[in-house]
Amino acid sequence: KTMNNYILQILEDIMAIDSPSGYTKNVITYCEKEAHQLGFQTKRTNKGNLEIFVDGKDDYTVGFCAHVDTLGLMVRSIRNDGTLAFTNVGGPLVPTLDGEYCKIITREQQIYTGTILSNSPAVHVFKDAKSLERSCDTMHIRIDEIVKSKEDVEKLGIQNGDYIAIDTKTTITDSGFIKSRFLDDKMSVAILFGMLKTLSQEKIKPLHNLVLMISTFEEVGHGSSYVPEYISELIAVDMGCIGLDLACSEYDVSIC
């Protein structure tokens, strides 16, 4: 139970740190500090990934990788009415974002909240409110500020290219279920920290050297595209696919 509590605490902590692909420095800093507290050395790559080193009994090295970056959005343009047009970071299922809360993160790290909405948001006004296709081209972001023009938004410091983080809605139920956006793959990162905690707490020295790689660009296609040559074997820890004729369920661990 204590280990479960630790893993859930790590999960809640990193879920609270917004990290769409390309904006992962803060969550990597958290992971780095946690690894140091457990007594492990780390290294940041030029790409921004974090490597955590565990000494083993021989020279063979096994790598584990999980990604801490998530899907997200980005300001495409500021519209004349003070709302934001957006594009996607990675491949979010855009229709599910209608009505979701979000944060706009400026270059100066000022954070503004907002809501992702359809361009026909009110059933009482728009005849196509129910039927309009939800896509980046037919949706916008309403900022939680009094803004009525492009100039009003620019005065806030919001620019094209600013990151937009989607509310994770993280919930841990009394029955033990975890509901959240971006469990892919922050849940796996939390589990790997549970492994590190066990190794540290029980003073276990594994047979082989271990390198845990926390990657930062998986959702845009090149998370661990480079693996250091000293790693002989790599185990990727990520979410499994469920549905159609696939044999797995939410209660399984899939080994590929």
Roles of regions detected by a PLM:
Residues 1-256:
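N-terminal hydrophobic/helix-forming segments and targeting peptides
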